[in-house]
Amino acid sequence: MKKLNVGLIGAGWMGKTHSFCYKAQRQIFGPDPFVPILHTICESNDNLAIKVQKEFGFENYSSNWKDLVKNPEIDIIDINTPNYLHYEIAKLAIEEGKHIYCEKPLTNSYKTALELANLAEQKGIKTLVGFNYIQNPAHFLARNIIDED
């Protein structure tokens, strides 16, 4: 099994959710072709970074996302920051040859999202935008209620 070092940016609610999922991956899905290694958690709040590092077993923590993205040991950048920061982080990650998992939305505009998609394709980078709630029954109910009017 291939080990992939994950650098996770943003230790808030969604960052913690992603951390939990990385830890639970094998129990839920069984043996996979790769094993995610929680390498570094990055958070501007050092106290929160240290707390999440200990809680989920990250090897390191950082408060500088640019240093994390440029770290040659990192294979995947997992972006869980406020939406307006996604573009800058994702663009640098692609330029640095890192694969990306980004919470929705990828960017705040179609134009910049298309730019990142094209750049990732040119560089052979795998990307994924997380729409974690797209299949949530509450969303189907809301859609049905809206459609009834």
Residues of each region from the PLM?
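Conserved G/P- and acidic residue-centered "switch" motifs that form tight phosphate/ATP-binding loops
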Residues: 10, 104, 149
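Local beta-strand N-terminus motif with an aromatic residue
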Residues: 38, 58, 74-77
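Short, conserved SAM-binding/catalytic segment
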Residues: 51-58, 115, 119-120
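Conserved SAM-binding strand-loop segment of SAM-dependent methyltransferases
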Residues: 59-64
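Oxidoreductase and adenylate-handling cofactor-binding alpha/beta cores
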Residues: 135-149
